[in-house]
Amino acid sequence: MPVAATNSETAMQQVLDNLGSLPSATGAAELDLIFLRGIMESPIVRSLAKVIMVLWFMQQNVFVPMKYMLKYFGAHERLEETKLEAVRDNNLELVQEILRDLAHVAEQSSTAAELAHILQEPHFQSLLETHDSVASKTYETPPPSPGLDPTFSNQPVPPDAVRMVGIRKTAGEHLGVTFRVEGGELVIARILHGGMVAQQGLLHVGDIIKEVNGQPVGSDPRALQELLRNASGSVILKILPSYQEPHLPRQVFVKCHFDYDPARDSLIPCKEAGLRFNAGDLLQIVNQDDANWWQACHVEGGSAGLIPSQLLEEKRKAFVKRDLELTPNSGTLCGSLSGKKKKRMMYLTTKNAEFDRHELLIYEEVARMPPFRRKTLVLIGAQGVGRRSLKNKLIMWDPDRYGTTVPYTSRRPKDSEREGQGYSFVSRGEMEADVRAGRYLEHGEYEGNLYGTRIDSIRGVVAAGKVCVLDVNPQAVKVLRTAEFVPYVVFIEAPDFETLRAMNRAALESGISTKQLTEADLRRTVEESSRIQRGYGHYFDLCLVNSNLERTFRELQTAMEKLRTEPQWVPVSWVY
């Protein structure tokens, strides 16, 4: 078969070589010869010639082994060389850029509007998200086969399994690995996602480091880290491989609710390997194998680093030193110590604000969602900071898109009042019964009458196809922050004292307001604003400083428009 194949290919090549002398010998037109050469050089014609040759062998009852058949057609080479790779793994971001560009022309072009509609379809978005997940290989590794012997991996490593690994680096450059002592040996404890070693893939967790540039490493992890950090040029590591299967990162994203600086952390195994972040940052957790230290990276990009785990940070924040005091009869040096008895409390809704102050906020798992419209817009802020003015302006600006609830009250209606216009009127007994049944988002009493917002009123506005705009107390956000109401929480922050005083003075002069606030009132507003931000800042999606009502309103409009065109990070409980 190989001989026949060679002869057939040689014959075709001879025809091609002789085409150059055909014009003078046959008088053929040059254009026709070019056409003939194209046919002869066509891969299809060459394949047909090979098929004819194979059919001839079959007619002659000549057996040809499959390996020669594959080699003859070149199939084995194509199978080895063909490797499909994704062009990119961030197609969702590309689509969002396209949608932003289409937003400018969608109103003038029906084709652009139709394209924008297709690109925002949930099925299409899910397809892109699945493609990006496969392209970036962020899928979970299947569990190991139960048939494998667990003791197999614990067998001693033969001496000939020692490997030499070469790495080129500059002095001071971190390799992205940490070490631990195990059985008197230095073992790779973790490999930081995105680091030099992780990118090269030459080292694995569990590998034993024996030598660095021919020098034994001993058993001190800090000394080895210092040696590797200061090394430059070519670094040769002598290792005993662990043969452990690497774990692919799982897609876990969290929103941080505290600031962290590894340089100030005395517990971190390696300060240089730590990842700094601030409250509100979004991180991807790429490794949670260690109970105390996770590996994470910022969603915007960059190398991974170590961060304290949920368990470690909870222990650290919950730890309170025992209050010690000397007993009345004790001496200065030899007296006994007694601890103050701690107060124990059961959770009560009436003590909701008290428990909020002691809530431990570490990480919140979130998920990235395609653009969608929120059902409620919640404005939080101190009294007198301008929440109600912003709510009214937003509803007047687009009454078809935004709406609000009608509050309920137990007071009797005035002669000029009508049911549902300004207030809904019910008896005090009925309202108290509904409050006990949990049908009110919030309620209060003023001059002997009850006032409140019913949860069903919010549902009614949402059912009408509108975004329900609410200006409520911060405690109410905990009730609203569910998959049913998917709120967008905006904190209206009070400006500094001088700006607030100037705003009140300008409102009086223009006739917008008739109430002159005292300095005590203004300072109370600033202090209350700071207190709300400290206690409930983890619930806020956006913070706006209301130093100018018109500018703040425009910023609020812009933020609401972005929700329709840009991806959003929401609590994972809203999705699953």
From Swiss-Prot:
Gene3D superfamilies: 2.30.42.10, L27 domain, P-loop containing nucleotide triphosphate hydrolases, SH3 Domains. GO terms for biological process: excitatory postsynaptic potential; long-term synaptic potentiation; protein homooligomerization. Its main location: cytoplasm. Residues 185-240 form the PDZ domain. SMART domains: GuKc, L27, PDZ, SH3. The keyword Magnesium does not apply. Keywords: Cell projection, Cytoplasm, Cytoskeleton, Membrane, Phosphoprotein, Repeat, SH3 domain, Synapse. Residues 249-317 form the SH3 domain. Can homomultimerise. Interacts with CACNG2. Interacts (via the SH3-Guanylate kinase-like sub-module) with DLG4/PSD95 and DLGAP1/GKAP. Interacts (via the PDZ domain) with CADM1 (via C-terminus). Interacts with KCNN2/SK2 (via N-terminal domain). Interacts with SRC. Postsynaptic MAGUK scaffold protein that links CADM1 cell adhesion molecules to core components of the postsynaptic density. In CA1 pyramidal neurons, required for synaptic KCNN2-containing channel function and long-term potentiation expression. Seems to negatively regulate SRC function in epithelial cells. This is MAGUK p55 subfamily member 2. The lineage of its organism: Eukaryota, Metazoa, Chordata, Craniata, Vertebrata. The gene is MPP2.
